[in-house]
Amino acid sequence: MDLFTQIKMAVSVKEAAEYYGLEVNRGNMVCCPFHNDRTPSMKLNEDYFYCFGCGATGDVIDLAARLFNLSSYDAAKKLAYDFGIDPD
């Protein structure tokens, strides 16, 4: 199984968002970190996120890549390290 599949199976978007400091409310909404957002406009689903304000969307790897300005591969490696997933 490749690293991308491993990450997507092991880490939900919500888990990653919470781990990286985003405050998730009861409706799985957060203030979008990708634009100036005062009220939660980003919806966190199990396997993807979507911002109703700026249109940002993607999976857990895309979220980490955008949060930390990383390539998809480097974001996957960061997620693996942060969540204790063996990339081999």
Regions found by a protein language model. Give the residues of each.
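N-terminal structured subdomain of primase-like DNA metabolism proteins
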Residues: 1-88
